[in-house]
């Protein structure tokens, strides 16, 4: 056997093996590698999108939280203002009610003073009539002398 023939036959067998591999096996391997590369690229892109969405969600949540705090502060300020308005209104109403009560009490006092004066006038008129009757030693008829009593009462006023 000759080394040249063995070497040539092995070269031919290797060439057939390379042709078979490139024709039938290699396209499937390349397709599988490309699919895996595509899946890896898609996974990385999804990871990047997820990271960006997480950052956006974090920013949105901080904005919403900031807005909620601001709104809560506004509500507290409005509530405090409303409370002070209610207190001021209650004070004003109490003042008005107190003034009404005071005016009513003053009117009642004036009425009582007037009633007491009127009662005193009548008593003084009665005493004057009794005194006059004792002085004259005769009884004065109150009905007959009503005009006289009315004029005395008017003078006392």
Swiss-Prot record:
Family annotation (Pfam families): ATP-synt_B (PF00430)
GO cellular component: plasma membrane; proton-transporting ATP synthase complex
Reported function: F(1)F(0) ATP synthase produces ATP from ADP in the presence of a proton or sodium gradient. F-type ATPases consist of two structural domains, F(1) containing the extramembraneous catalytic core and F(0) containing the membrane proton channel, linked together by a central stalk and a peripheral stalk. During catalysis, ATP synthesis in the catalytic domain of F(1) is coupled via a rotary mechanism of the central stalk subunits to proton translocation. Component of the F(0) channel, it forms part of the peripheral stalk, linking F(1) to F(0).
Molecular-function GO term, any one: proton-transporting ATP synthase activity, rotational mechanism
Gene3D superfamilies (alphabetical): 6.10.250.1580
Membrane-topology descriptor: Single-pass membrane protein
Subunit structure as annotated in this protein's UniProt entry: F-type ATPases have 2 components, F(1) - the catalytic core - and F(0) - the membrane proton channel. F(1) has five subunits: alpha(3), beta(3), gamma(1), delta(1), epsilon(1). F(0) has three main subunits: a(1), b(2) and c(10-14). The alpha and beta chains form an alternating ring which encloses part of the gamma chain. F(1) is attached to F(0) by a central stalk formed by the gamma and epsilon chains, while a peripheral stalk is formed by the delta and b chains.
Keyword Oxidoreductase part of the UniProt annotation: no
CDD domains the UniProt entry points to: ATP-synt_Fo_b (cd06503)
Organism: Nitrosomonas eutropha (strain DSM 101675 / C91 / Nm57)
Keyword NADP: no
Similarity comment: family membership: Belongs to the ATPase B chain family.
Subcellular location: Cell inner membrane
Alphabetical list of NCBIfam families matching this protein: ATP_synt_b (TIGR01144), PRK05759.1-2 (NF004411)
Protein name, entry field: ATP synthase subunit b
Alphabetical keyword list: ATP synthesis, Cell inner membrane, Cell membrane, CF(0), Hydrogen ion transport, Ion transport, Membrane, Transmembrane, Transmembrane helix, Transport
TM ranges: 7-29
């Amino acid at each position: 056997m000759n080394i040249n023939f063995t070497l040539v036959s092995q070269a031919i067998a290797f060439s057939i093996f390379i042709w078979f591999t490139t024709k039938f096996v290699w396209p499937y391997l390349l397709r599988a590698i490309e699919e895996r590369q595509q899946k890896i690229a898609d996974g990385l892109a999804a990871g990047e999108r997820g990271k960006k969405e997480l950052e956006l969600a974090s920013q949105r949540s901080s904005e919403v939280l900031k807005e909620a705090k601001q709104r809560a502060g506004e509500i507290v300020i409005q509530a405090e203002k409303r409370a002070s308005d209610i207190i001021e209104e209650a004070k004003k109403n109490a003042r008005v009610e107190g003034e009404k009560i005071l005016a009513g009490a003053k009117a009642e006092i004036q009425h009582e003073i007037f009633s007491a004066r009127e009662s005193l006038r009548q008593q003084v008129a009665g005493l004057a009539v009794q005194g006059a009757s004792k002085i004259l030693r005769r009884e004065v008829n109150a009905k007959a002398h009503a005009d006289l009593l009315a004029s005395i009462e008017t003078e006392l006023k």
